[in-house]
Amino acid sequence: MRYLTAGESHGLSLTAIIEGIPAGLTLHPADIDHELQRRQGGYGRGTRMSIETDRVQISSGVRHGKTTGAPITLTVINKDHQKWLDVMAVGDIEETLKLKRRVKHPRPGHADLVGGIKYHFNDLRDALERSSARETTMRVAVGAVAKRILAELGIDMLHHILIFGGITITIPSKLSFRELQERALHSELSIVNPKQEEEIKTYIDKIKKEGDTIGGIIETIVQGVPAGLGSYVQWDKKLDAKLAQAVLSINAFKGVEFGVGFDMGFQKGSQVMDEITWTPTQGYGRQTNHLGGFEGGMTTGQPLVVKGVMKPIPTLYKPLMSVDIDSHEPYKATVERSDPTALPAAGVIMENVVATVLAKEILETFSSTTMSELQKAFSDYRAYVKQF
């Protein structure tokens, strides 16, 4: 399984092409639209989300509600493009129009300046448009297809926010996976403690008035993954490493942890390692899950626990100082539309990116041309792991 995305933030559309999806997977536009709507939700989103109502068009690889095994083409139209016809025109236009929305004051924290240097852009909009988080629309669309595969194999997942702009979410003890999932899904903030909703919303409103932004830490949990996915035989086969790369590829993500993560640096080995158990009904298990479901780059059969830290959005309504790329004089950075926070949306993106990596790993491990073949191979492997 592999995919490519294409498109700009204010271009005509965003596109993804996915190759390697087995034939026979039930897939409807509504499956993808559901995830796209989740990405557009959450408290603290800006005006762009009120302009766009993302809906996917499937133009290949699916017939009568089933995948055919051919490449799948997904497209989302940018409604906002109508206001940017001159600025984002494919053909050449008058010089005066080119200057209309030219970006020459790069924003600290964005790809503007370095992208302009790398690709020799005189107008930094060419870097801004492609590096925008709008591209994650298609990462979510691809992830929605991946989640359909995982669901057919009995794998489920959730995400929730652990730290919201410096406020630590108090997680009620002994919540089951399903309870965590339900609480996060029904929260505008993707948190599992409803008692903290108003405090955080008030803080977001305050940050918005200040023209500032906040980041935080997101946790994704995956349930139902058997032991043995990934490999220790080569560095690039380790599944946790693949997940780390994928999570860090999400806009504004700057760090990844598994299990208790960086807290391991403060603990002894006897406190960190997960003791092994065995029962006739469940097979091998662990007393704890400090390592987040990974040992030696492979899954252990425990829930996968992946955490990602998202920096505050770098586009500020009270912009920081920058430099004019023509005169090299100090100027305030360009201001584009922005949100005080996009943590709930980033959680949806992270969840779908993790789903894509897992689906790809499963398809590589259990090579199958049809879903029925994949389901049988996966079921047989589960049975083998249980009786080992």
Swiss-Prot record:
<comment type="pathway">
    <text>Metabolic intermediate biosynthesis; chorismate biosynthesis; chorismate from D-erythrose 4-phosphate and phosphoenolpyruvate: step 7/7.</text>
</comment>
<feature type="binding site">
    <location>
        <begin position="311"/>
        <end position="315"/>
    </location>
    <ligand>
        <name>FMN</name>
    </ligand>
</feature>
<protein>
    <recommendedName>
        <fullName>Chorismate synthase</fullName>
        <ecNumber>4.2.3.5</ecNumber>
    </recommendedName>
</protein>
<feature type="binding site">
    <location>
        <position position="39"/>
    </location>
    <ligand>
        <name>NADP(+)</name>
    </ligand>
</feature>
<dbReference type="InterPro" id="IPR000453">
    <property type="entry name" value="Chorismate_synth"/>
</dbReference>
<keyword id="KW-0057">Aromatic amino acid biosynthesis</keyword>
<dbReference type="InterPro" id="IPR035904">
    <property type="entry name" value="Chorismate_synth_AroC_sf"/>
</dbReference>
<feature type="binding site">
    <location>
        <position position="337"/>
    </location>
    <ligand>
        <name>FMN</name>
    </ligand>
</feature>
<keyword id="KW-0288">FMN</keyword>
<feature type="binding site">
    <location>
        <begin position="130"/>
        <end position="132"/>
    </location>
    <ligand>
        <name>FMN</name>
    </ligand>
</feature>
<dbReference type="GO" id="GO:0008652">
    <property type="term" value="P:amino acid biosynthetic process"/>
</dbReference>
<feature type="binding site">
    <location>
        <position position="45"/>
    </location>
    <ligand>
        <name>NADP(+)</name>
    </ligand>
</feature>
<keyword id="KW-0274">FAD</keyword>
<dbReference type="Pfam" id="PF01264">
    <property type="entry name" value="Chorismate_synt"/>
</dbReference>
<feature type="binding site">
    <location>
        <begin position="251"/>
        <end position="252"/>
    </location>
    <ligand>
        <name>FMN</name>
    </ligand>
</feature>
<comment type="similarity">
    <text>Belongs to the chorismate synthase family.</text>
</comment>
<dbReference type="GO" id="GO:0005829">
    <property type="term" value="C:cytosol"/>
</dbReference>
<dbReference type="GO" id="GO:0010181">
    <property type="term" value="F:FMN binding"/>
</dbReference>
<dbReference type="GO" id="GO:0009073">
    <property type="term" value="P:aromatic amino acid family biosynthetic process"/>
</dbReference>
<keyword id="KW-0285">Flavoprotein</keyword>
<feature type="binding site">
    <location>
        <position position="296"/>
    </location>
    <ligand>
        <name>FMN</name>
    </ligand>
</feature>
<comment type="function">
    <text>This reaction introduces a second double bond into the aromatic ring system.</text>
</comment>
<comment type="subunit">
    <text>Homotetramer.</text>
</comment>
<keyword id="KW-0521">NADP</keyword>
<keyword id="KW-0028">Amino-acid biosynthesis</keyword>
<keyword id="KW-0456">Lyase</keyword>
<dbReference type="GO" id="GO:0009423">
    <property type="term" value="P:chorismate biosynthetic process"/>
</dbReference>
<dbReference type="InterPro" id="IPR020541">
    <property type="entry name" value="Chorismate_synthase_CS"/>
</dbReference>
<dbReference type="GO" id="GO:0004107">
    <property type="term" value="F:chorismate synthase activity"/>
</dbReference>
